[in-house]
Curated annotation (Swiss-Prot):
Proton-sensing G-protein coupled receptor activated by extracellular pH, which is required to monitor pH changes and generate adaptive reactions. The receptor is almost silent at pH 7.8 but fully activated at pH 6.8. Ligand binding causes a conformation change that triggers signaling via guanine nucleotide-binding proteins (G proteins) and modulates the activity of downstream effectors, such as phospholipase C. GPR68 is mainly coupled to G(q) G proteins and mediates production of diacylglycerol (DAG) and inositol 1,4,5-trisphosphate (IP3). One of its GO terms (biological process) is cellular response to pH. The lineage of its organism: Eukaryota, Metazoa, Chordata, Craniata, Vertebrata. One of its GO terms (molecular function) is G protein-coupled receptor activity. The record marks H17, H20, H84, H169, H269 as: Proton sensing. This is G-protein coupled receptor 68. Gene3D superfamilies: Rhodopsin 7-helix transmembrane proteins (1.20.1070.10).
Length: 361
């Protein structure tokens, strides 16, 4: 608890941080333990997709890199909450960790939106828009997303984000009640960083489901499987990001007193913790549902066991290499969403007979 001060002016906000300081370490440790290895494997899977000239791998690698940047900032935030919300490092490190914390949300939303649009074009328009489904196009879009968020982060570097409370604790990225300068950037975050991308994402997945329902060559069990995956993706996306952005908007519209700040503090910080779980959900949804990933992970495990056996016995032993997609053309492996087990298959144009194609090209 403490009176938050900013620019040497007391805000007189006595806010109880107990619930936040209890929940945050649990969430941060969980995301560190599960999210770091999961995202490292996700990065490997994205590399295989890029090696196979699949544009999906570009988005997946960028999404994973953003998650790993955020995960790397978690030890600092863990230390912060364990020290009762006291930032023991310099001001610049607070700004950098704050940028990694908050901008990761919008970088993730951007790349999740790109993945959904790419899958929509692959399923609903498999014979059109090839110019948008190339490595060059994916790298260009990815660069725009990073530049957009880097420019936004300059705003935070221009303002002081470390302030002292009445207990002489240096709090980082916490201003209660909300400062007037923060409202504009919060409206931008809500409208441009969240609302617009999620409308695109929902429209894309709706188009995917419509295209699959119209596909006569896809079995009902596979259609049901696709529907479950799409719905799971949307539900997890909304669960991770919607509560935070609703409360961010509420704070920006109505938080002008300490009483309001104290009333919304726990709910707001709980919603912020929910966004952390996206770092764990991303690799699970977009990589580990693939049969190919299961096979590669099994081979990786076999190679590791073989290596350990060699080291223990001192005898040379052959280890099977990891499987990788073909180096030329599109991957023959199941693609995320569109080749799930291999549930998503390219619809044939009207009048074209035979069973559906084995995958997207």
């Amino acid at each position: 608890m403490g009176n938050i001060t900013a620019d040497n002016t007391s805000m007189n906000c006595d806010i109880d941080h107990t619930i936040h300081q209890t929940l945050a370490p649990v969430v941060y440790v969980m995301v560190l333990v599960v999210g770091f290895p999961a995202n490292c494997l996700s990065l490997y899977y994205g590399y295989l997709q890029i090696k196979a000239r699949n544009e999906l791998g570009v988005y997946l690698c960028n999404l994973t890199v953003a998650d790993l940047f955020y995960i790397c900032s978690l030890p600092f935030w863990l230390q912060y909450v364990l020290q009762h919300d006291h930032w023991s490092h310099d001001d610049l490190s607070c700004q950098v960790c704050g940028i990694l914390l908050y901008e990761n949300i919008y970088i993730s939303v951007g790349f999740l939106c790109c993945i959904s649009i790419d899958r929509y074009l692959a399923v609903a328009h498999p014979f059109r828009f090839h110019q948008f489904r190339t490595l060059k196009a994916a790298m260009g879009v990815s660069a725009l997303i990073w530049v957009k968020e880097l420019l936004t982060s300059i705003y935070f570097l221009m303002h002081e984000e470390v302030v002292e409370d009445a207990d002489r604790h240096r709090v980082c990225f916490e201003h209660y009640p909300l400062e007037p300068r923060q409202r504009g950037i919060n409206y931008y975050r809500f409208l441009v960083g969240f609302l617009f991308p999620i409308c695109l994402l929902l429209a894309s997945y709706r188009g995917i489901l419509r295209a699959v329902r119209r596909s006569h060559g896809t079995q009902k069990s596979r259609k049901d499987q696709i529907q479950r995956l799409v719905l799971s993706t949307v539900v997890i996306f909304l669960a991770c990001f919607l509560p935070y952005h609703v409360l961010l908007l509420v704070r920006s519209l109505w938080e002008s007193s300490c009483d309001f700040a104290k009333g919304i503090f726990n709910a707001y910080h709980f919603s912020l913790l929910l966004t952390s779980f996206n770092c764990v959900a991303d690799p699970v949804l977009y990589c580990f549902v693939s049969e190919t990933t299961h096979r590669d992970l099994a081979r990786l495990r076999g190679a590791c066991l073989a290596f350990l056996t060699c080291a223990r016995t001192g005898r040379a032993r052959e280890a099977y290499p990891l499987g990788a997609p073909e180096a030329s053309g599109k991957s023959e492996d199941p693609e995320v969403l569109t080749r799930l087990h291999p549930a998503f298959q390219t619809p044939h144009p009207p009048g074209m007979g035979g069973s559906p194609a084995g995958g997207l090209s």
